[in-house]
């Protein structure tokens, strides 16, 4: 995996966005539990229009942590969208 920028740390989670040139649509974030199983991660698609956050892939993360990660990303959606645009440009619809 390429370099990743940490754009949010809260509630024991680290939220990151892959840095260019490693970009692949759709817009998404990688969320890891800071103090739990090493390597556990969930990839969440950022909201598009009326659709909310969508779980794309889960790697070894407990269901309760996945739910908490979704809530965290939903609560910080505007911040994460700005971060995506900062690193990848455009309207963040990619």
Predicted feature descriptions by range:
Residues 1-16:
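Negatively charged, low-complexity tracts enriched in Asp/Glu with abundant Ser/Thr
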Residues 7, 29-31, 73:
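Hydrophobic aliphatic residue packing
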Residues 15, 20, 28, 91-94:
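Residue-level detector of solvent-exposed, low-hydrophobicity positions
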Residues 15-20, 45, 77, 81-86:
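Broad hydrophobic/π-residue packing in well-ordered secondary structure
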Residues 20-63:
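A short, structured beta-strand/loop element
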Residues 56-94:
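Well-ordered alpha/beta subsegment
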């Amino acid at each position: 995996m390429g370099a990743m920028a940490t754009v949010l740390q809260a509630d024991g989670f680290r939220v990151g966005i892959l840095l260019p040139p490693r970009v692949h649509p759709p817009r998404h974030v990688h969320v890891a539990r800071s103090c739990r199983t090493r390597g556990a991660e969930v990839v969440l698609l950022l909201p598009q229009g009326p659709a909310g956050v969508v779980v794309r892939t889960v790697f070894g993360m407990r269901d309760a942590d996945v739910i908490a990660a979704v809530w965290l990303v939903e609560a910080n959606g505007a911040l994460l969208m700005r971060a995506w645009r900062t690193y990848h440009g455009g309207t963040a619809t990619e």
